């Protein structure tokens, strides 16, 4: 039996892909300890891991799912939060790791405290990457905006100051690249396929492209029309009442069944009286819906796009951040989705109709699905973890 430790930030998009891996590890009889934050406790414990709360030690940060979603998008904010969190958890985590003596640490690419502790204590380490893998080649494809680059340059003095604080505590961090990317010698699990990953052939064999880790559906969705349209803007930045109203207007007179997931921030009454063909809910079982859907109008978070493509469902792409824009661009490049250029009712209806009426979108989504299935999923991820653990 191996002892495996996971570290993650409190973001659903970073936590959910690891849960199938945890289930597979525990099913094989291995022991899993998972360090995260209270909002994630129920999900993690349900997967079979021993949950360890970081909240009592990281008391000044009070990291929330919204903070977790922001990490990785704002480099100065990310660096400060991650350094503060690493230092806050330093004593507790290092003491725990010395006492527990895990065979391997698996840390989210943004949970740099896991990577830093593994380096500090010489514990075998794997990076868990829930976005596209990042190197100098893929960076050219997933370009940042000019304003983002300027913001990063202006923030460099503060970033360097924060990194020095880590070095002062014994962490072998050379520069910002040690935080935001892995080198070709770092064992890395990436939850996509080589076919979907930009510039996949530029990564070393230390990178295991295992495909999405998809949990089982927990509900059964009834499809009552020939065509089912699913609309969701994710779990964090989804306070988009005007957009939801526009979607309702776009499909009010359509022959389509529409399921609209609004998130918890929207007052259902603010949507008005819904047509019979449209259902609006604060939360739905996305996996269950995608198994029946014909088109997904999505913000293009990596998880949502991957789940859609896993079931061969083409997308209408409406990204809200630069990171989501990178995912949307890749889906469009591979012909599995169409970008929504304007968010008015006519444009929404036209885009959805175009995807439905053009067979190549579904065919290309099916091709990506098949590439995911070839990767091995959670079983392949566990094989990678155990191969690294065996080096101890």
Whereabouts are the PLM-identified features?
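Nucleotide-activated sugar donor-binding and catalytic core shared by glycosyltransferases
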Residues: 1-33, 39-50, 95-99, 104-107, ...
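Nucleotide-sugar-dependent glycosyltransferase catalytic domains
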Residues: 2-3, 30-229, 233-256
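Ser/Thr-centric signal marking residues that sit
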Residues: 8, 192, 232, 261-262
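Short glycine- and Lys/Arg-enriched binding-loop motifs that mark or flank ligand-binding interfaces
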Residues: 9, 207, 230, 259, ...
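Short glycine-enriched loops at secondary-structure junctions
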Residues: 10, 57, 131-132, 264-265, ...
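Generic structural signal for alpha-helix starts
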Residues: 204, 215-217, 267, 275, ...
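Residue-level signal for pocket-adjacent positions within structured domains
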Residues: 208, 216, 231, 266, ...
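Catalytic donor nucleotide-activated moiety binding site of glycosyltransferases and closely related
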Residues: 235, 245-279
């Amino acid at each position: 039996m191996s002892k495996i430790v996971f570290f993650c930030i409190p973001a659903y998009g970073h936590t959910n892909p690891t849960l199938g891996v945890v289930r597979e590890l525990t099913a094989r009889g291995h022991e899993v300890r998972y360090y995260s934050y209270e909002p994630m406790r129920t999900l993690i414990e349900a997967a079979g891991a021993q949950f360890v709360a970081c909240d009592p030690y990281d008391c000044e940060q009070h990291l929330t799912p919204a903070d977790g979603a922001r990490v990785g998008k704002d480099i100065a904010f990310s660096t400060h939060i991650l350094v503060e969190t690493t230092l806050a958890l330093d004593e507790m985590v290092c003491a725990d790791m010395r006492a527990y003596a895990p065979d391997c640490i698996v840390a989210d690419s943004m949970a740099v405290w896991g990577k830093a502790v593994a380096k500090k204590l010489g514990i075998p380490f794997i990076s868990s990457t829930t976005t596209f893998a990042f190197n100098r080649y893929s960076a050219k494809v997933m370009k940042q905006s000019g304003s983002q680059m300027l913001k990063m340059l202006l923030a460099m003095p503060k970033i360097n100051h924060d990194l020095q604080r880590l070095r002062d505590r014994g962490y072998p961090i050379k520069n910002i690249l040690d935080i935001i990317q892995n080198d070709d010698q770092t064992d890395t699990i990436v939850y996509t396929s080589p076919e979907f990953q930009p510039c996949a052939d530029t990564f070393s064999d230390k990178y295991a492209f295992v495909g999405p880790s998809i949990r089982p559906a927990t509900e059964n969705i009834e499809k009552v029309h020939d065509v089912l349209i699913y609309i969701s803007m994710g779990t964090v930045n989804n306070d988009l009442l005007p957009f939801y109203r526009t979607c309702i207007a776009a499909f009010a007179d359509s022959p389509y069944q529409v399921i609209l997931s609004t998130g918890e921030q929207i007052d259902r009454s603010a949507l008005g009286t819904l047509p019979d063909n449209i259902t609006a809910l604060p939360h739905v079982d996305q996996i269950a819906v995608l198994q029946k859907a014909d088109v997904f109008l999505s913000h293009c978070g990596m998880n949502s796009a991957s789940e859609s493509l896993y079931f061969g469902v083409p997308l209408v792409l409406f990204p809200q951040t630069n990171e989501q824009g990178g995912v949307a661009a890749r889906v469009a490049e591979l012909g599995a989705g169409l970008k929504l250029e304007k968010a008015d009712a006519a444009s929404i209806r036209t885009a959805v109709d175009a995807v439905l009426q053009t067979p190549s979108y579904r065919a290309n989504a099916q091709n990506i699905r098949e590439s995911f299935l070839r990767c091995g999923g959670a079983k392949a991820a566990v094989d990678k973890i155990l191969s690294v653990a065996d080096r101890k």
